[in-house]
From Swiss-Prot:
GO terms for cellular component: cytosolic large ribosomal subunit. InterPro entries: Ribosomal_uL15 (IPR030878), Ribosomal_uL15/eL18 (IPR021131), Ribosomal_uL15/eL18_sf (IPR036227), Ribosomal_uL15_bac-type (IPR005749), Ribosomal_uL15_CS (IPR001196). Residues 1-58 are annotated as: Disordered. Part of the 50S ribosomal subunit. It holds the Pfam family Ribosomal_L27A. Residues 21-31 have a biased composition (Gly residues). Binds to the 23S rRNA. GO terms for molecular function: rRNA binding; structural constituent of ribosome. Disulfide bonds: none annotated. It comes from Ectopseudomonas mendocina (strain ymp) (Pseudomonas mendocina). GO terms for biological process: translation. Belongs to the universal ribosomal protein uL15 family. This is Large ribosomal subunit protein uL15.
Amino acid sequence: MQLNDLRSAPGARREKHRPGRGIGSGLGKTGGRGHKGQTSRSGGSIAPGFEGGQQPLHRRLPKFGFVSLKAMDRAEVRTSELNKLEGVVTLQALKDANLVGQHVQRVKVMLSGEVTRAVTLKGIAATKGARAAIEAAGGKFED
């Protein structure tokens, strides 16, 4: 016996449905779509959110909020991520280490995790907790 001789037991696999291939298949003529109507036609599906001509929910509700453009050029860095850097940490150093995107113009350090290295942050803002943690580890800030 070879691998190519192996066959499934009779009745183990169901034959796939082939709609519209005669009455003997059980899905002949209308192919399981029923008679007439939108969903019996080809391309008869309706778009998600369509409510039959009634004003859809997303247009009945009022607009609110906006997208801040400032969020596009600002970023946050965790204190634990500063352990990947050495010496003086600048905005360009963070970009080179892929900790912030290339479009970022301002960075703020947040307290999250431990600081194990003494780093000097140049031109980078920090929260009170992050500032205390960095200075406790022997780091300092320059403006």
